[in-house]
Every structure is written in C-alpha cells, then in structure tokens.
Amino acid sequence: ANPDLEVMVAGGDGDGYSIGAGHFVHAARRNVDMSYVVMDNRIYGLTKGQASPTSREDFETSTTPDGTNQTPVNPLALALSSGATFIGQTFSSDAQSHAEVVRKAIEHDGFGFVNVYSPCVTFNDVDTYDYFRDSIVDIGETDHDPTDRDAAIERVTEGGTEYTGVIYQDPDSVPYEQREGIESNMAEIPDGAPEDAMDLVREFY
C-alpha cells in the first residue's frame, strides 16, 4: 500500500510450509518486493511438539509415534520452483552471517526468502544446535555461483548437505510493483467512496 516502506514478514516452518504455503508460493511467483524470513525448527514448537512439514520422515512425536512417513518439504526447492528471485539460508546461532544474508534479502529488488535453521531445544532432540554446527556448509566457501539458477537447483536438491548463505539471486529481477506500474501510495487516497458509487448503493437499498 505504501511503496516507500520495506515489507518484512516473519513466520515458522509450521505455518509457512503448511497452511500458509499458498501465500508463500504466490508471493514468490509474483516476485512481490518483500522479504520473508522463516524460522525453521522442523517441529510445531508452540503446540507442544507435533511434526511439521520439514520434520524428518522417521521423526517420532506424540502424534506420529512411528514417524511421519512423509518426505519433508524442502523449503529452498519450494522457493526456487515457485520463482523466488532471492533465496538464502542461515543458522540462528551464527548471528553475523544471518544478519548479512537478511540484509541482502531486504536490499534485493523482488521477493527475498530466507530459511533460518532455528533449533527447538524443548521438543526436537534430533535437529539440535550441535547437529547443525557439525552439518552446515557455508556455500560461500564453495565454487557456487548464486546467479546460476541451474547450479542452485543442483545444490538445493542435494541430499544430506545443510547449506547456508545466498543460494540464489537473480541479478535481473524486476519486482511485481515495477513490472505492473504500481506507483501510487494508497495511504494518500482520500477516504470514502466516490459519489457515483454511493448512488448505486442508494438505488439498491
């Protein structure tokens, strides 16, 4: 509504990749100029530890005692296949790197998505801080080119590697608002309906 504001949305893996997945996909597809940061702890922490869309297939909880028996959602692959023009991943324990990736997402012209590994110390004893510290690979220390979409696809579909850093960024991204010529500040539109619209209301009521 106000093109002068930076729009940031924060959520979790439970809502973002489940009931809110449709909003995520279409915001990415349209390339809306906003940043979306998801705290991914691979569990529903606030509702006492049920499996989330990113929980491991064999992850046992009170509601899935035999595991989920479902392939977990791959957030980076979902974002990439939906058309996101900036995709990053960070670890909540590495504040400096996290802040840098989020800054780049905010500065990006278009939809900036950051998935954040945020271990739940209460209900998830598998995907722990120690697990991520041992498993994470900083993609910036590899030969990865974040502007190469095919390379990004290859990285996000690799099994067993937990990458952090900027996975993909389209240098030619044109945000939805610019592409569609949306320039007006809706906050400056006068209140109230036009008089001709009110005439229609009076005619039927």
Q: Which role fits each region the language model picked out?
A:
Residues 50-57, 95, 102-111, 125-138, ...:
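Short, surface-exposed, charged loop/turn segments at secondary-structure junctions
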Residues 9-11, 86-91, 113:
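Short catalytic-loop micro-motif centered on adjacent basic/acidic residues
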Residues 4, 52-105:
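Conserved thiamine diphosphate
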Residues 120-205:
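Flexible, low-complexity linker and terminal segments
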Residues 19-23, 29, 46-51, 124-129, ...:
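Short acidic, glycine/serine/threonine-rich loops at helix termini
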